[in-house]
């Protein structure tokens, strides 16, 4: 997402709203495992993006208070809003991880990862493979939103589906919106495509049309 200007004095893109937090400029650094650590986020802050999401954090490791994981959900004093991305396949564990983040004031925004296409994640039924399990997906999203209890906005990031014959993004988007997420982000490729080819921008438009009546961006 970028801010488009027809001339230096004209503003076209509006700020994003995440709960009570204004993301201005409306530019988000996507969470990337092994990359978006504190040092990298600091470098990107100097370039002026509005929101910086942590590396993908495993909800179970957070609940077990793994030392490396706890370090991943720590932020610099000048980092705001603080944004954590969680990954998990168990609703109860996801809820417990969210409660830790909220009760210990570790973040101002929580994103859930349903977009990772890496085989070691999808083989366990997680990441971009999880929305195919409709009931489990709904349970995890509801568990996270309920655990946050309105104190921290929750969002989801997902892909179009497993492949072109197993698309999930429209139903998953509706499910997440009805569960009360603040926004839905779509990586407009399938799991099968990984990072190759071109993103399907028309899918983003279709998802927006699907979610507009639910007032979820």
Residue ranges and their predicted role:
Residues 2-217:
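Flavin-dependent oxidoreductase catalytic cores
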């Amino acid at each position: 997402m970028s801010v488009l200007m027809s001339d230096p004095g004209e503003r076209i893109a509006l700020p994003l709203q995440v709960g009570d937090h204004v993301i201005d400029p409306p530019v988000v650094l996507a969470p990337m495992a092994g990359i978006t650590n504190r040092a990298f986020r600091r470098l990107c802050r100097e370039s002026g993006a509005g929101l910086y999401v942590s590396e993908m954090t495993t909800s179970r490791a957070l609940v077990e208070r793994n030392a490396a994981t706890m370090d991943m959900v720590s932020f610099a004093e000048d980092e705001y809003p603080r944004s954590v991305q969680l990954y998990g396949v168990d609703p109860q564990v996801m809820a417990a991880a969210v409660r830790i983040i909220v009760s210990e004031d570790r973040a101002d925004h929580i994103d859930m990862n349903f977009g990772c296409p890496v085989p070691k994640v999808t083989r366990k039924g997680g990441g971009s493979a999880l929305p195919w399990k409709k009931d489990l997906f709904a349970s995890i999203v509801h568990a996270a939103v309920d655990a946050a209890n309105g104190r921290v906005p929750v969002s989801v990031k997902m892909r179009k589906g497993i492949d072109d014959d197993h698309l999930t993004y429209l139903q998953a988007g509706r499910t997440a919106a009805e569960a009360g997420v603040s926004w839905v982000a779509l990586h407009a490729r399938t799991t099968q495509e990984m990072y190759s080819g071109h993103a399907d921008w028309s899918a983003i438009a279709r998802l927006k049309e699907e979610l507009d009546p639910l007032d979820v961006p």
